[in-house]
């Protein structure tokens, strides 16, 4: 997998804010690899997480322009830190190697409604890429991956 740039935005929740953000990506010619929008602990505020493939020189300039949008509270380009995805892969048939891989990758093997095995695993994008490669002999019928979850890490605070 190519290196990804992850941008995290905190936004107010009015209609159209996501469309304005996406329009800026388009105008800058930056391709979105994945996009996720979710609620935050703060009512009325959402987090938009966007990944782009490769290192684009224009991403920092794009972040600067996104900061100027009315409903944007914060923009951060995330480097390092914690990045996780979820992979769900349906296989044609079970195989002895499947359960060894599940143990190795700390994955779960489930059964789909049609009886086919389904592998569920969370991990870094690179880990899931490696698992998919190793699952190839098990005949991957289809798979789905979530977008990168990459919380902006701040110094720990006391919670008690």
Describe the predicted segments one by one.
Residues 1-6, 10, 14-45, 51-86, ...:
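Long, contiguous binding/interaction regions
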């Amino acid at each position: 997998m190519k290196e990804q740039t992850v941008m995290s935005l905190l936004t107010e929740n009015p209609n159209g804010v996501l469309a304005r953000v996406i329009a800026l990506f388009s105008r800058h010619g930056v391709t979105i690899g994945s996009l996720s929008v979710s609620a935050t602990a703060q009512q009325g505020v959402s987090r938009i997480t966007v990944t782009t493939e490769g290192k684009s020189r224009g991403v920092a300039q794009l972040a600067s322009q996104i900061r100027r949008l009315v409903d944007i509270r914060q923009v951060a380009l995330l480097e390092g830190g914690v990045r996780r995805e979820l992979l769900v892969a349906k296989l044609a048939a079970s195989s002895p190697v499947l359960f060894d891989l599940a143990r190795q990758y700390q994955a779960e093997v489930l059964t789909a409604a049609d009886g086919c095995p389904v592998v569920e695993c969370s991990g870094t994008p690179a880990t899931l890429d490696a698992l998919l490669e190793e699952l190839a002999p098990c005949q991957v019928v289809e798979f789905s991956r979530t977008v990168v979850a990459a919380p902006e890490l701040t110094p720990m605070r006391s919670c008690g």
